[in-house]
Amino acid sequence: MKICLLGDTHFGVRNDSKIFHKYMENFYTEVFFPALKERGVDQIIQLGDLFDRRKYINFYTLEQSKRYFFDVIEREGFVMYSLLGNHDIFWREKLDVNSPTLLLEAYKNIHIIQEPVVLDNADVIPWLCKDNEKQIHEFIDKSTRPYCFGHFELKGFEMSKGIENHEGMDPSVLAKYKQVFSGHFHTKSNKGNIMYLGTPY
C-alpha cells in the first residue's frame, strides 16, 4: 500500500473562479494523477477543506470538481480518506452538517472522517471545535500510534508566508507523535515533529 498526502484543495476558491478551476484541472490532470499512477499509489489522505465555501455549494464548482477530481478517483480505483476541515462544516462549533458528507456519499471509495479514527498505524483527526474538543484530547492522550494526520490550528506556525499564528492549540499537545502532518495553513512549514503540507497548487 502506498499513500499520498494531499493538503487543502478548496474547490470553489475565489468565488468559484473559472480561471482557478482550469488551473486546478491542469494540476490534477497533468501532475497529480499521473504521479500517483507512476509511483503505484493506491490511497489518498486529504487533510481537510475539500470545498472552499462553508454555507453553500456552487453547482459549477460541484460539476467541475467531480469531473476532474472525484470521478477520476472513482474511475482509477483510488481510495480516499478526507478528514473534515473548518471550511467543510456549516456550523462553527460542530461537524455534523458538512459539505463532503452531503455531496460525496455516492462515491463508495471516498470516506469522510468526522471523528477521530485509527487508520493503519496513524491517528486521523478532523477539525477541533467546542463540540469535539474533549473527545479529541482524550483520543490523543490514549493514543500509542506514531503518526497523526489532522487539520490543526497550532500556535507558532505560519498561516501564510511571514505571518505567524498566535491562536489555537499549543503544539506540545502533539509532542507524543513521531510525525504529525496537518492541513489548514496554506504555507508549507516544518517545525519539530509537525509538518504543514500547505496547498498543493
Model-derived features: positions:
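N-terminal active-site segment of His-dependent metallophosphoesterases
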Residues: 1-67, 136-145
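Structural motif
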Residues: 3-5, 45, 124, 147-151, ...
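Active-site glycine-centered loops adjacent to acidic/histidine catalytic or metal-binding residues
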Residues: 8, 48-49, 85-86, 151, ...
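Metal-dependent catalytic neighborhoods of phosphoester/phosphodiester hydrolases
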Residues: 15-17, 48-69, 84-107, 167, ...
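A short helix->loop->beta-strand "cap" motif at the edges of active sites that frequently abuts
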Residues: 75-80, 176-178
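Active-site regions of enzymes building and remodeling cell-envelope glycoconjugates
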Residues: 108-111, 121-122, 145-146, 162, ...
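Binuclear metal-dependent hydrolase catalytic cores centered on His/Asp/Glu-rich metal-binding motifs
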Residues: 116-172
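Conserved beta-sheet core of the metallophosphoesterase superfamily
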Residues: 154, 160-201
